């Protein structure tokens, strides 16, 4: 797995994050949106992270959707398989 993808997985494992929060991680400033999207899709496809919808009641209002956009309503969580991968590769003890 790419080093950037592993770092994204480690960050999501530490704290569940939205796409915007992942995008604003300090070590991803030089990575394109395509690279971040590819890493997240790879993690989802390999079942290392899951998406969960949050703030479902807030998202029903039109002004909330206009202000925050689509990506705010989902958070990424590390799965058990993802945490096991991190342990095997030395990110967790």
Each model region followed by its residue ranges:
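Short alpha-helical segments that sit at the start of domains
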Residues: 1-11, 15
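Short acidic, hydrophobic short linear motifs in intrinsically disordered regions
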Residues: 17-27
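Short amphipathic alpha-helical interaction segments
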Residues: 30-46, 50-56, 73
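A short, conserved strand-capping beta-turn/loop at the end of a beta strand
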Residues: 54-64
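Short, amphipathic alpha-helical interaction segments positioned at domain boundaries
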Residues: 62-93
